[in-house]
Design a protein with these regions (language model features):
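Alpha/beta-hydrolase fold catalytic core
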Residues: 1-64, 81-90, 126-127, 284, ...
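Active-site loop/oxyanion-hole signature of alpha/beta-hydrolase fold enzymes
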Residues: 36-60, 77-80, 84-136, 140, ...
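Active-site glycine-rich loops that stabilize anionic/oxyanionic intermediates
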Residues: 60, 68-71, 135, 260
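The serine-hydrolase catalytic nucleophile loop
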Residues: 69-81, 267-268
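Alpha/beta-hydrolase active-site loop signature
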Residues: 70, 96-100, 162, 286
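Flexible "cap/lid" loop of the alpha/beta hydrolase fold
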Residues: 142-192, 196
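Conserved alpha/beta-hydrolase catalytic His-Asp/Glu region
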Residues: 169, 186-246
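Conserved serine/cysteine hydrolase catalytic core
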Residues: 218-281
């Protein structure tokens, strides 16, 4: 059994040759400043996130991309390069805690992820910035905008809203399937990936979803493991699917990109009222009938 250590086009007006800076950190760290991954005692201790920064014009607000659950900064490789070339802005892609090359921690709260991002943005001098978050990353972006509106020049939330998405999520099944995968040691990577795909297919019929999850399969000294922190993500899944209730509001320019066939935001439902569902954001809300796939 394994251990686990259509593109959306953003309008040019919303955002504005580059070189690259990268940072990778050890894959296992812990934070003791939480109580069970949901409710946080005091300010959570920020972790040093892994990131990739494409250089650009320093006088323009940088574009920062935040991935969703089981994702990583590599999800945005193509769009990040395109945005850097098209807008001449700095573009930052980041691995969230418990994902990609960033450290692992038992604290999966959005407060903790917001603190991580605030620390990184200050470290890199990217305040204020245009914050673009998909799914889990969208909730992190929304929370940061509420906590520190001066940090977020503009906000883009992709296929997500500040609502509980647990009832429509299949992620629990995905995590159970990933945990059950069993790959022998010292097999070729291509064969290991094929074995994992075959085992996942009994639960996850969509090959696109399987290929996305398999981006997390890594080899360390002949042993294959999942780089996402499955134990912690599974334990605190409900907290990840929910959104912290906050009294603040964010008055900056905000764009919600909602997929027409999204399972996470049922905007086509007659009961969906943007002003009631999104009370903390400006009344101008753009709902696009697109597939929000990254």
């Amino acid at each position: 059994m394994l251990r686990w250590a259509r593109a959306c086009r953003v309008p040019r007006g919303l955002l504005g040759p580059s070189t690259t800076r990268c940072s990778a950190v050890p894959s296992v760290l812990s934070s003791s400043d939480s109580s069970g991954g949901g409710r946080v005692v005091g300010n959570p201790r920020p972790l040093p996130l892994s990131y990739k920064l494409l250089d650009g014009e320093a006088t323009l607000p940088a574009i920062v991309f935040l991935h969703g659950l089981f994702g990583s900064k590599t999800n945005f490789n193509s769009i990040a390069k395109a945005m850097a070339q098209r807008t001449s802005r700095r573009v930052l892609t980041v691995d969230a805690r418990n994902h990609g090359d960033s450290p692992h921690s038992p604290d999966t709260s959005y407060e903790a992820m917001s603190q991580d991002l605030q620390g990184l943005l200050a470290q890199l001098g990217l305040v204020p910035c245009v914050l673009v978050g998909h799914s889990m990353g969208g909730k992190t972006a929304m929370l940061l905008a509420l906590q520190r509106p001066e940090v977020v020049e503009r906000l883009v939330a992709v296929d997500i809203s500040p609502a509980d998405t647990t009832p429509v999520s299949h992620f629990r099944n995905y995590m159970a399937a990933m945990k059950s995968v069993d790959i022998p040691e010292k097999v070729p990577r291509s064969h290991a990936r094929k074995l994992a795909d075959e085992q996942l297919s009994s639960v996850i019929q969509d090959p696109t979803v399987r290929q996305f999850l398999l981006t997390n399969l890594v080899e360390v000294n002949g042993h294959f493991s999942w780089r996402v922190n499955l134990d912690t993500l599974a334990q605190h899944f409900d907290k990840i699917m929910n959104f912290p209730q906050r009294p603040e509001s964010y008055s900056g320019p905000t764009l919600f990109l909602l997929g027409e066939k999204s399972r996470f935001v049922q905007w086509q439902d007659s009961e969906f009222d943007p002003e009631k569902a999104l009370p903390c954001w400006p009344p101008v809300l753009q709902l696009l009938g697109i597939w929000a796939l990254l």
